[in-house]
Amino acid sequence: MSFTAQLLRGVRLTLLLWLLTVVVITLPLLGVARLVAPEAAAGSLLRRDGAVVGARLIGQPFGSARYLQGRPAGAPNLAASNPELSQRVAAAAKGWQRGGISQPAPDLLQDSASGVDPHLSLTAARQQLPRLARERQLPLEELERLLRQHREGPLGLQAIEPVVNVLGFNLALDALSVRAASSQPAP
């Protein structure tokens, strides 16, 4: 068999496999996903005023103290025995302690396996409520109620406690702040 014939045979096989894996398998699966779970199939996007502000299943950083902070992002894949990991966790703990949390929950200190975990344990979220109440000038009880409304889970086999979606909670927190500000009497 000549080189050209082998090349054409390889190209045809590649195109056939592409057609099989992309068209024959993926498109029907996407169609079923859109029927069964349309929100998840569309990326679980969250919107505010019609604009996409993030994805429910992907964690994102919030730089302002006015927001609930999620898990650290960008997992370094360091072994538990690596001194750099211990230094990172100690530095994160000191940062939270300066912010008023004497014993931060583990998920405030440790990266998630994926580095983009959108959830936070209720314990870690509750630890941040006093700061949010102070920054937003909202009653702590109101924030506790909001946290209970956004409680999910436990999720999956590894989670032993309920969680909160950080982006979803922060969007609700913004809405609560707007409602609270509009109900204040004018000076």
Describe the function of each predicted region.
Residues 128-133, 167, 171:
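Alpha-helical support elements that line or immediately flank enzyme active sites
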